[in-house]
């Protein structure tokens, strides 16, 4: 089974709070409705556009998504 984006994102949780990636990871961790098992870009981006108040910019997600695909 492929690792979910959420599992990938958690590796960034403990870092400098000024980093938007760290804030995204911490926000997703605190978001109990985040689609934790998803590996689908459309599902994740749609969810974040509607519910990701903790995400500074969708660019942060898009860049992490590219890294996730590269490392998967």
From Swiss-Prot:
Q: Which domain of life is it from?
A: Bacteria
Protein name from the UniProt record: UPF0346 protein GK1571
Name the family: Belongs to the UPF0346 family.
Which Gene3D superfamilies is this protein grouped with?
YozE SAM-like
Query: What Pfam family does this protein match (any one)?
Result: YozE_SAM_like
């Amino acid at each position: 089974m492929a690792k979910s984006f959420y599992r990938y994102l958690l590796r960034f949780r403990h870092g400098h709070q000024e980093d938007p990636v760290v804030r995204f990871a911490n926000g997703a961790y605190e978001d109990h409705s985040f689609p934790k098992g998803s590996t689908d870009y459309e599902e994740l981006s749609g969810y974040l556009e509607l519910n990701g108040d903790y995400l500074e910019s969708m660019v942060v997600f898009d860049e992490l998504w590219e890294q996730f695909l590269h490392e998967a």
